[in-house]
Swiss-Prot record:
Lacks the C-terminal regulatory region which is replaced by HisZ. It catalyses: 1-(5-phospho-beta-D-ribosyl)-ATP + diphosphate = 5-phospho-alpha-D-ribose 1-diphosphate + ATP. Catalyzes the condensation of ATP and 5-phosphoribose 1-diphosphate to form N'-(5'-phosphoribosyl)-ATP (PR-ATP). Has a crucial role in the pathway because the rate of histidine biosynthesis seems to be controlled primarily by regulation of HisG enzymatic activity. The keyword ATP-binding applies. The keyword Cell wall biogenesis/degradation does not apply. This is ATP phosphoribosyltransferase. GO terms for cellular component: cytoplasm. It comes from Pseudomonas fluorescens (strain SBW25). It is found in: Cytoplasm.
Length: 211
């Protein structure tokens, strides 16, 4: 049995057509079903529907053989015990700093609000900058507006939400896309099955971007 961990939302919507290329189609619509374990048209493949931030944990600990996770989540989580064999080139965005339009960056200690605490620590350590990291789980844009932080670090797609709140994207940190991840033990135990799936998905990704 192959178990694939996915999270609802944009990643799921973009991943399902790629899985369909490999003949893997859920027997129920994951967006409408309340089930968290969903069979597929292949008897030996099932989907686990979990939170985006939990996908690497399920895969690392072997509760899922494979998963699809954003590079932002993998950068924050660390990705130990995982293979990352394929960039699916879906859910594209950028990880960036952002701040209020026209604000001058303070020379002293910087206050940065983000849910990507580990990424922020590494980023500013590489710059030799002292920062106070404030962990938030959502509505990052509020932090600079009410004086909680000087900057935020968040994923930026169109930038419309930032601009609507008087903020602007500033420093680029990383390009983000969704990656296929594989449990290392599963790769050894089910190598032929998993490698065949990787190859099929790679062809589907390449075909989509050629078109």
């Amino acid at each position: 049995m192959l178990t694939i961990a996915l999270s609802k939302g944009r990643i799921l919507d973009d991943t399902l057509p790629l899985l369909a290329e490999a003949g893997i189609v859920p027997t129920e619509n994951p967006d409408k079903s309340r089930k968290l374990i969903i069979p597929t048209t292949q008897d030996d493949v099932r989907l686990l529907i979990v939170r985006a931030t939990d996908v690497p944990t399920y895969v690392e600990h072997g509760a899922a053989d494979l998963g699809v996770a954003g590079k932002d989540v993998l950068m924050e989580y660390g990705g130990q015990g995982l293979y990352e064999p394929l960039d699916l080139r879906i859910a594209l965005c950028k990880l960036m700093t952002a701040g209020r339009v026209g604000d001058v960056e303070p020379k002293g200690r910087l206050r940065v609000a983000t849910k990507f605490v580990n990424v922020a620590k590494r980023y500013y350590a590489e710059q030799g900058r002292q920062v106070d990291i404030i962990k938030l789980y959502g509505s990052m844009e509020l932090a600079p507006l009410i004086g909680l932080a000087d900057k935020i670090i968040d994923v930026v797609d169109t930038g419309n939400t930032l601009r609507a709140n008087g903020l602007e994207p500033q420093d680029f940190i990383a390009d983000i896309s969704s990656r296929l991840i594989v449990n290392k033990a599963s790769m050894k135990m089910q190598h032929a099955r998993i490698q065949a799936l990787i190859d099929t998905l790679r062809k589907a990704v390449e075909s989509r971007h050629r078109g």
